[in-house]
């Protein structure tokens, strides 16, 4: 069970991230829905052997590896992300995330609100509702 200011990640709604990779699990931990309007801290579980394909965008990614073993490749350079490591992927750089371990790769990824489709949509609706003086 989650409160307004505390909770278990496993109790947070799972959001559809199937476009990223087969079997990936995504939960938005901190975002506009619970008070962080400018950024979104997302909890991902990337299954063994899966990858989020190469892509680029203008915003940075900030990653913290929680469990398992992943790598991030930035413009062809490979950076190891075993449990407890972190990485920053600069905006504008082509990058890919891979699970290279023997189980799930679990990590936190922080991006600006406009860098997450669920957070962006929620924020737009909340802003519109605020203008109309109604609940989102």
Where are these regions (language model features)?
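A short, N-terminal "cap"/entry segment at the start of jelly-roll beta-barrel domains
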Residues: 1-38, 121-136
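Ligand-binding loop in jelly-roll beta-barrel domains
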Residues: 35, 91-117
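Short, conserved beta-strand element in jelly-roll/cupin
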Residues: 43-47, 56-72, 110
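A generic "binding-loop/recognition-motif" signal
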Residues: 48, 58, 77, 93-94, ...
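Short beta-strand His + acidic residue motifs that chelate non-heme Fe in jelly-roll/DSBH
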Residues: 52-54, 72-73, 89, 95-101
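Short acidic-glycine-tyrosine-enriched beta hairpin
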Residues: 77-91
């Amino acid at each position: 069970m989650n409160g307004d200011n505390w909770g278990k990640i496993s109790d947070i709604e799972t959001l559809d991230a199937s476009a990223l990779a087969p079997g990936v699990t995504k939960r938005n931990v901190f975002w506009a829905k619970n008070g962080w309007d400018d950024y979104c801290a997302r909890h991902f579980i990337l299954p063994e052997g899966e990858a989020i394909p190469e892509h680029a965008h203008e915003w940075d990614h900030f990653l913290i590896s929680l469990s398992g073993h992943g790598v991030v490749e930035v413009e062809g350079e490979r950076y190891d992300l075993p449990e407890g490591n972190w990485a920053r992927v600069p905006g504008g750089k082509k990058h890919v995330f891979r699970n290279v371990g023997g189980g799930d790769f679990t990590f936190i990824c922080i991006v600006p609100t406009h860098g997450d489709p669920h957070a962006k949509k929620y924020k737009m609706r909340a802003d519109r509702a605020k203008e109309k003086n109604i609940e989102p």
